[in-house]
Amino acid sequence: MDSSRDDKRIQVTREYFRLADQGRREVLDLFHDEAEIYFPKFGFGFGRQSLFEMVKGFDGVLEFIRHDYDKLTFIPAGDYVVVEGTSRGRLSGKTWAGGETPGGRFCNVFKFHGDRISSLHVYLDPDYTGEDIPRFRWGADRKW
């Protein structure tokens, strides 16, 4: 285990969340040119520009998103950093807050080549605001 390498990669993932939440193009500098991106309902994208292709799916509906930086859990393992956490935001006028509403919990798997991200797989329910009522088979009166 190389703790300095792990610390550097965790720092890069923290920077990813900060830049992504701000919608800053500099987020692309954290990725390899041929990076692989996966997001539910988007599928796979290849090349770092595919990150913005994925984000375009939220054009006109995502008012803001903020990851809860102080509650992120980082798990370094070899070339990977797994991050579990919550986010909050507003989509089409409706808010969500991970841990308080059905949407907003996520797990991201970052793969690194050197100090740059070569792969990002995002695992979450993209129904952030809980509008997919027919599939709430266990009811909405749950602890989130």
In which residue ranges do the predicted regions lie?
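A solvent-exposed, acidic/Ser-Thr-rich amphipathic alpha-helical stretch
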Residues: 7, 25-77
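Short, aromatic-enriched amphipathic alpha-helices that serve as compact interaction elements
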Residues: 4-22, 30
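Hydrophobic pocket/interface hotspot
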Residues: 13-16, 27-28, 35, 47, ...
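A beta-strand edge to alpha-helix "cap/lid" segment located at domain peripheries
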Residues: 1-5, 21, 56-144
